[in-house]
């Protein structure tokens, strides 16, 4: 398995160069590996746990699957969503009842990929830079989402561009995303394929500013 640690070993020379030039403000956004998976946790800035579960992301096809951990909290329903960002389609899946809700997604930016117009803010060490295996070098990116009257901040590993954390600040809500145990593989590529019972389901109406961030709420 290719973990954050392995990626940092493989790209150690490149990272050393990057660290030495971290003061350069016009650094171009890095690109996520083609496949990533792991655990994603979302909380509100008020400290409320909104969702926690397994994510899978295909950066080449721009497809994302998130299945909430049913043991995470005492809820009556749990999130299982599949998003095809390129096509602008969002599926809300209920595997227990074999039902599916399909919506259009007009706004297609999200926090699994750094937007091309993001600004490189800084490169920092989390933990200790001098003690072996006691630190992680990250790059911080930020930018605006004018269509949503919002702005964001993203942290990725310097070695490999893996997601570490992200913040979204909007008019309706503020969200904080954390990523754990990130791998550069997906166990089952079929997670990006809608279940058969989603076929033929009509699109439900959604507002023009409907976005990935609307999935997470109290």
UniProtKB/Swiss-Prot annotation:
Note whether Secreted occurs among the keywords.
Answer: yes
One GO CC annotation, please?
extracellular region
Q: Where in the cell is it found?
A: Secreted
The organism sits in which domain of life?
Answer: Eukaryota
User: What SMART domains does its record include?
Assistant: EPEND
Secretion signal span: 1-20
Entry keyword Secreted? yes
Swiss-Prot/TrEMBL keywords? Calcium, Disulfide bond, Glycoprotein, Secreted, Signal
Which organism is the protein's source? Devario aequipinnatus (Giant danio)
Give the family per the record: Belongs to the ependymin family.
Query: Which residues, renumbered to this chain, are glycosylated?
Result: 74, 97
Q: What is this protein called?
A: Ependymin
Q: Which GO terms describe its biological process?
A: cell-matrix adhesion
Q: Describe PTMs of this protein.
A: Binds calcium through the terminal sialic acids.
Q: Which gene encodes it?
A: epd
Which is one GO molecular function term here?
Answer: calcium ion binding
Assembly notes: Forms disulfide-linked dimers.
Q: Which Pfam families match?
A: Ependymin
| The protein's role, per its UniProt record | May play a role in neural plasticity. May be involved during axon regeneration.
């Amino acid at each position: 398995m290719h973990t954050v640690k392995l990626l940092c070993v493989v790209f150690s020379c490149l990272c050393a160069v990057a660290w030495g030039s971290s003061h350069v403000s016009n650094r171009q956004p890095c690109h996520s590996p083609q496949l990533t998976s792991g655990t994603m946790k979302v909380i509100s800035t008020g400290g409320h746990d909104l969702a926690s579960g397994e994510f899978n992301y295909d950066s080449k096809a721009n497809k994302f699957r998130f299945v909430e951990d049913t043991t995470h909290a005492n809820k009556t329903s749990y999130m299982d969503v599949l998003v095809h960002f390129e096509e602008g389609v969002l599926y809300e899946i209920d595997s227990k009842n074999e039902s599916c809700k399909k919506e259009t997604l007009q706004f297609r930016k999200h926090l699994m990929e750094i937007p091309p117009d993001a600004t490189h803010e800084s490169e920092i060490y989390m933990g200790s830079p001098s003690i072996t295996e006691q630190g992680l070098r990250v790059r911080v990116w930020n930018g605006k989402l004018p269509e949503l009257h919002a702005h964001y901040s993203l942290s990725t590993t310097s070695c490999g561009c893996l997601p570490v954390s992200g913040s979204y600040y909007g008019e309706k809500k503020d969200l904080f995303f954390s990523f754990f145990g990130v791998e550069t593989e997906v166990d089952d590529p079929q997670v990006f394929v809608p279940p058969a019972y989603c076929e033929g389901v009509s699109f439900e109406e959604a507002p023009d500013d409907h976005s990935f961030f609307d999935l997470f709420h109290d």
